[in-house]
């Protein structure tokens, strides 16, 4: 009888651990599109909850004209990433440690033509 209780307790703990890790792994923000001489600014917000300890940023940009700016701000208001991309290709991956809370990403385009995708994942 005691063995069954221990096995059941271990199974419950394992399920809780998997649930918590799945919550962090699948907590993400994604945006992407094709652009044609586009000038606009997007403000994207996403909140990471505990047990996330930070975020991973993936940027893929392929522009034939214009510029794109990507800015990432963490929950404390600290600017974690700020870069302007011109015509060409860029594939960036950055990891940031920070408290949980609302992250803000600004993606601004000026006469941009091409494709882009940005992804922010809790870690």
Q: Each PLM stretch: what is its role?
A:
Residues 1-8:
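Bacterial N-terminal signal peptides that target proteins for export
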Residues 19-49:
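Transition segment at domain starts
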Residues 44-55, 94-99:
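Extracellular and analogous surface-interaction loops
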Residues 48-63, 104-107:
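Hydrophobic beta-strand segments within beta-rich accessory/binding domains
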Residues 62-67, 111-113:
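Short proline/glycine-enriched turn/loop motifs at strand-loop junctions of beta-rich domains
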Residues 65-81, 120:
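Short, surface-exposed beta-strand/strand-loop-strand elements in extracellular ectodomains
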Residues 82-87:
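Short beta-strand segments within Ig-like beta-sandwich modules, predominantly Fibronectin type-III
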Residues 109-123:
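Edge beta-strands of jelly-roll/beta-sandwich modules across compartments, strongly enriched
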């Amino acid at each position: 009888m005691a063995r069954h209780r221990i096995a059941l307790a271990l199974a419950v703990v394992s399920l809780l651990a998997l649930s918590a890790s799945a919550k962090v792994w699948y907590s993400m923000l994604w945006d992407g599109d094709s652009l044609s001489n586009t000038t606009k600014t997007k403000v994207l917000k996403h909140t990471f909850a505990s047990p996330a300890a930070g975020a991973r940023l993936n940027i893929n940009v392929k522009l034939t004209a214009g510029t794109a700016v990507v800015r990432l701000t963490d929950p404390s208001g600290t600017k974690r990433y700020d870069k302007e991309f011109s015509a060409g290709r860029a594939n960036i991956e950055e990891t940031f440690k920070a408290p949980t809370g609302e992250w803000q990403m600004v993606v601004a385009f000026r006469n941009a033509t091409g494709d882009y995708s940005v992804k922010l994942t809790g870690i």
